[in-house]
Design a protein with these regions (language model features):
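Short alpha-helical elements of helix-turn-helix
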Residues: 7-11, 31-42, 53, 67, ...
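C-terminal regulatory/oligomerization modules of transcriptional regulators
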Residues: 1, 5, 123-145
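Short, locally clustered residues in the helix-turn-helix/winged-helix DNA-binding domain
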Residues: 14-17, 42-46, 107, 134
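N-terminal leader segment of winged-helix/HTH proteins
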Residues: 1-31
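Short capping segments at the starts of secondary-structure elements
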Residues: 47-51
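Helix-turn-helix DNA-binding motif, specifically the short coil turn and the N-cap/start of the second
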Residues: 62-65
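The alpha-helix within a helix-turn-helix
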Residues: 56
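Charged, amphipathic alpha-helical coiled-coil/dimerization segments
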Residues: 21, 71-131
Length: 145
């Protein structure tokens, strides 16, 4: 099979994903963040007081990698780690005011990319595309099993 010909759909999905990733990466870079740091901030925002183990599971990364992500965020005063009274072995993770502001900026990046995607679609096309992409995702997900 020649890419771009018989595999036109997969080629276009790949290109759209690549364009989206470049956009997100570029926007995060202006904030001094990478994708893992932004995902960690978002998770901590949604799960205030979470522990590192839960973040490791969410990110799907090794503990050492997540430790480095957290160190970088802590050095930039975006998060704080606190030892709870009842368990001195596990530190809870919380956003600082600066971290909360960064989360808002990160979320705006995704709002902006969603707006760019929707700009070229009618409401009906949006709904149809979303439905079709969910079908493709479900089909590909069952292939992983």
């Amino acid at each position: 099979m020649e890419l771009g010909k018989k595999d036109e759909l997969s080629e276009n999905l790949f290109l759209v994903n690549s364009i989206q990733q470049v956009y997100i990466h570029t926007q995060l870079k202006t904030m001094g963040l990478n994708i893992q740091q932004s995902r960690a901030l978002n998770y901590i925002s949604e799960h205030s007081g979470t522990i590192q183990k839960e973040l490791v599971n969410y990110l799907g990364k090794q503990k050492a990698t997540v430790t480095n992500v957290l160190k970088a965020l802590e050095e930039r005063n975006l998060i704080v780690r606190r030892v709870p009274e009842h368990n001195e072995r596990q530190k809870q993770l919380f956003l600082t005011a600066e971290g909360a502001a960064a989360v808002q900026q990160v979320q705006q990046i995704f709002v902006d990319i969603e707006g760019k995607i929707n700009a070229g679609l009618t409401k009906e096309e949006h709904a149809q595309l979303l439905n079709l992409l969910q079908k493709v995702k479900a089909t590909l997900s069952t292939d992983e099993d």
